[in-house]
Amino acid sequence: MASSLAQSRISNLQNHLSPLEANNKLRSLVKISPQVSEALSNGRAVVALESTIISHGMPYPQNLQTAKEVESIVRENGAIPATIAILNGVPCIGLSEEELERLASLGKSVQKTAGRDIANVVATRGNGATTVSATLFFASMVGIQVFVTGGIGGVHRHANHSMDISSDLTALGRTPIAVISAGVKSILDIPKTLEYLETQEVYVAAYKSDEFPAFFTEKSGCKAPSRVNSPEDCARVIDANMKLNRQAGILFAIPIPKHHSAAGNLIESATQRALTEAREQNVTGNAETPFLLARVNELTGGTSLAANIALVKNNALIGSQIAVALSQLM
């Protein structure tokens, strides 16, 4: 009797809530900019952009200028930018100039929002800057297939003691979106991060390189699991991943432009010092990465920030080309 009742309830749910209806209900919870909505409806190339780099990655007004320049690069290469953030509890897919300015000026007072934090920020009508994991969630909700960021989170050094592993990795393992980044941040344990990505069944390929990049430097000393040589190569992989209905994501690792990679040794030295200081000051959790990046920037006299901006712009360029190539296959 109980089994029959349960089956009846499941049948009723299926009748009243089809996958399409469920998706429409989810989309009604977010605000999609007119430009992004039109592009998605017409099958045009759209590139998702995270917002933590704006609020926590660099100071105002440099963060606003960089965000505008990155969006311009996306547009110039034939795609529509969709910067994602939560404003007054409303998830926004694509920001107006006024919203972008507000987010940038609020800076670190905006909550750094990973996937686990989304419900709380929405429920409390807060302001949230999305990390990779949260951006993946919202991009997937509205059907964006390509996401550009600076670098993803990963397995932290000494994770065998702290168990500090970014939710970016598990989010990638369950979200079929292509992430374009300069690899993982050099403050992390890159070999262990690659191992964890393999465990999560994430396809990882370096762009025009056989070696996995280390954010501020072209090479990490780790062989890339795979290699792609063009935006079209990347688009074909994404297309096949979608058609096969695989639920894991893709990571395309783009080496930093050569003329900004030269300062890699200086930045690595500063990174080691910053890591030591973080341990001494007991800086942990989601406060660690912003602390380390800010301290490395201080120790390098701004060199690391300039390199960070350069690699994000380069990722936006290549990511846009990938999104356009993908739109031509669909």
Swiss-Prot record:
Sequence similarity: Belongs to the pseudouridine-5'-phosphate glycosidase family.
Active-site residue numbers: 50, 185
Cited HAMAP family: PsiMP_glycosidase (MF_01876)
Gene Ontology terms for molecular function: metal ion binding; pseudouridylate synthase activity; RNA glycosylase activity
InterPro entries membership: Indigdn_synthA-like, PsuG
Subcellular location, record wording: Peroxisome
Record organism: Arabidopsis thaliana (Mouse-ear cress)
Protein name from the UniProt record: Pseudouridine-5'-phosphate glycosidase
UniProt keyword terms in alphabetical order: Glycosidase, Hydrolase, Lyase, Manganese, Metal-binding, Peroxisome
One cellular component term from this protein's GO annotations in UniProt: peroxisome
Catalytic activity: D-ribose 5-phosphate + uracil = psi-UMP + H2O
Annotated binding of substrate, by residue: 112, 132, 166-168
